[in-house]
A protein has these predicted regions:
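Asp-based, Mg2+/Mn2+-dependent phosphohydrolase catalytic module
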Residues: 2-27, 134, 148-150, 156-257
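Active-site neighborhood of HAD-like aspartate-dependent phosphohydrolases
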Residues: 12, 16-68
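Short histidine/acidic/glycine/proline-rich micro-motifs that form metal-
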Residues: 35-37, 75-76, 147-151, 178-179
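Short acidic alpha-helix initiation/capping motifs at coil-to-helix transition points
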Residues: 41-48, 81-92, 150-151
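A metal-dependent, Asp-based hydrolase signature
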Residues: 70-113
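Short, acidic loop-to-helix structural element flanking the phosphoryl-transfer center
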Residues: 105-106, 114-144
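Short, flexible loop segments at the rims of nucleotide/cofactor-binding pockets, characterized by
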Residues: 119-123, 152, 180
Length: 257
């Protein structure tokens, strides 16, 4: 239904640009809870269960492993940009595990390419986002996967596969290998725009977190908040953002391109 709507909208693009509105050149999407329909808490619980099942039989302590993952993630979120997120994670992980991350990285990549796929069971429904993303790209726009870069590329690729997509379907994907900041730091978004040579005022951001995703509006980005799996622990008034379920927001986005 979205694609049929898009075909009609594409024929009227010029009429939908609006008076003083900047022409949109770039669309950014969050991943978890936005393109992928799942509850973040259920995802994390399943992720920790499966990664523990991978590494505990190899002789690693479960509690230490989970603490290393949590603390490593927390330190990436606080990254000040001096090094890439991967380096922050490596340092924290090595300190707690008393073993260099590089020595375990092969096992981590194997996990993200294989066992991690079982976390797909947390999806609330089977969806295929390929047609939707293609419709946007066919308009000549840049499409960015602006997922919080606390995971390696391999983990993002596996999650994208669940919804019929690949990292190759995007012009840019934020990963812990290529990013120096995390959400909700505005520097995270500034780094994206610098790397893809786009302007915030010519961009749209679609996400489900009222703080982490919507904060980019402070740079002049037009934002859309997905409410299907809304994340809003800060109790931000979401009425100040354009919001709705995924299908509603998808059609709104297509309507202004």
């Amino acid at each position: 239904m979205i694609i049929q709507t898009a075909k009609k909208i594409i024929n009227d693009v010029e009429d939908n640009l609006g008076g003083n509105m900047e022409k949109i050149t770039t669309v950014l999407f969050d991943l978890d809870g936005t393109l992928i329909p799942f509850d973040q808490k259920e995802f994390i619980e399943s992720y920790l269960y499966h990664i523990s099942n991978k590494f505990v039989p190899m002789g690693y302590d479960k509690n230490t492993l989970i603490k290393a993952l949590w603390d490593g993630t927390g330190n990436m979120v606080k990254n000040d940009g001096k090094v890439r997120n991967r380096d922050v994670f490596k340092s924290t992980f090595a300190e707690l595990m008393e073993k260099e991350y590089d020595e375990m990285e092969g096992d981590f990549m194997e996990f993200y390419e294989k066992e991690f796929d079982d976390v797909k069971q947390t999806l609330q429904e089977e969806v295929d986002r390929a047609g939707f993303i293609k419709t946007i790209k066919d308009q000549g726009l840049k499409v960015v996967l602006a997922t919080n870069p606390i995971f390696p590329k391999a983990a993002i690729q596996t999650r994208l596969k669940w919804i019929g997509l690949s990292v190759d379907d995007f012009d840019y994907v934020t990963t812990f290998e290529n990013s120096h900041y995390c959400k909700p730091n505005l520097e995270y978004y500034k780094e994206i725009f610098e790397n893809i040579n786009s302007k915030p005022e010519e961009s749209i951001m679609v996400g489900n977190n009222a703080l982490e995703d919507m904060i980019v509006s402070e740079l002049g980005v037009r934002t859309f908040l997905i409410t299907d799996n809304l994340e809003n622990p800060e109790k931000i008034d979401i009425n100040k953002f354009e919001n709705g379920n995924f299908d509603d927001i998808a059609n709104k986005v297509l309507n202004i391109l």
